[in-house]
Regions:
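N-terminal signal peptide c-region/cleavage motif recognized by signal peptidases
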Residues: 15-19
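Short, solvent-exposed mixed-charge patches
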Residues: 130-132
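Short, exposed beta-strand-loop hairpins at the edges of beta-sheets
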Residues: 104-106, 112-126
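Boundary at the C-terminal end of the N-terminal hydrophobic targeting segment
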Residues: 20-24
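Contiguous, well-ordered beta-strand patches that form the walls/edges
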Residues: 59-109
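Bacterial N-terminal signal peptides that target proteins for export
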Residues: 1-7
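Hydrophobic helical h-region of N-terminal Sec-dependent signal peptides
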Residues: 8-12
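Short, solvent-exposed loop/hinge segments that bridge or flank secondary-structure elements
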Residues: 25-26, 31-65, 69
Length: 132
């Protein structure tokens, strides 16, 4: 299994746990709530990235088990709830290669999550859901 980068880590958002259903994770997510308007739009009642979204804070769009970032697309393959975190394995593609990645998610408040990875170095990143 390959190690992950912070963008791939974002795929954690579609996990299901006892406290959170996948449908509850659907939406637009970013590391900076003040950047929501610069990153996301709705086209035909569907969330989409604005043209220059990658110039602003990191973000992604979650629809069920599908997660779309500005440069990658992922599909959740497996979930394991250990009580305090949900461990996820996802298959991600950057348009050139496909790889499996592993990471954890913790619900840190209403419309807030913290994504973490232990490899290649420990990384922990908070995300907030944009109201769209």
């Amino acid at each position: 299994m390959r190690t992950i980068n912070p963008l791939v880590l974002l795929t954690l958002l579609v996990m299901q746990s006892a406290s959170t259903q996948a449908a509850d994770m659907d939406g637009a997510w970013t590391i900076d709530a003040s950047a929501c308007a610069q990153m996301f739009t709705k086209e035909n009642n569907k969330l989409a990235f604005k043209q220059d979204a990658d110039l602003h804070a990191g973000g992604l769009i979650v629809r069920g088990k599908q997660i779309t970032g500005t440069f990658q697309k992922c599909t959740v393959k497996s979930l394991h709830d250990d009580g305090s975190n949900v461990q996820v394995i996802a298959s991600c593609s950057d348009g050139v290669a496909v790889s499996d990645v592993a990471f954890d998610i913790k619900i840190s408040g209403e419309n807030r999550i913290t994504l973490s990875s232990k490899e290649p170095v420990p990384v922990e990143m908070p995300y907030v859901r944009c109201s769209m």
